[in-house]
Amino acid sequence: MLLANYGACEVDRVRHLEEAFCCIAATRMADIPVVNRALSVEALGFEQCAESAGGSDGEMGILITPWFMNLIWLAPYGPCLGERDASTLPVGKTCMRRFGSHDFEFIGASEPQFGPYQFCSLFSPMFEFANQASARATATEVLRLLRASPDAPLPPTCAPHRDRRGFLFGRRRIEGESL
C-alpha cells in the first residue's frame, strides 16, 4: 500500500477500506464466477488531494479487488472515521470530478464495514490481469497519469515527421527546422 502525506487516521482509514473488501472477497464474492483468483484486495496510492477546478478536498487512490479495479474518492471525515462530511455523495447518485484535464463520473456507495465512499470503475471483471503485479502496475500508471501536471508536456509518441521533399532529395531536415 503506497501512502503519501498521511497521518495515522488516514492510514487506518485506507487499511479499514482494504479490510472491508477482504471480508467481502471472503464472503459475498467467494463463489462468484467473475472473481479472478490470481488477484487479491489491495488499496494503492491513496493521497490527500483536491480535484482540479476548485473541487473539494478528499483522498484518492485505487482499490484493486479480484473482481474490479476502481478509482476511489474518500470524502473528508471528522476525527478518525467520525462524522461524515457534507460532501459525501448519496448511494447510487453520480457526480463528475476533474483530475488534470480529465472528467470522471463517480458513483456514491457505502459498505456496512467501512462507510461511504465514491468509485469510478476502471476495470471489471479483472480477467485481463494474469497476476497481482500486472494489476498493480496498471493502477500505478493510472495514478501517475492522473497526478501529472496538466501543463506538463506529453512524451513524444513517435519520431518527428520528416519533410517529404527532403527525403526524396536526400536532405535530412525535419519538418519545422530551418535549413
Swiss-Prot record:
Pfam families registered for this protein in UniProt: NiFe-hyd_HybE
Keyword field: Plasmid
Protein name: Protein HoxT
Lineage, top ranks: Bacteria, Pseudomonadati, Pseudomonadota, Betaproteobacteria, Burkholderiales
Gene name as annotated: hoxT
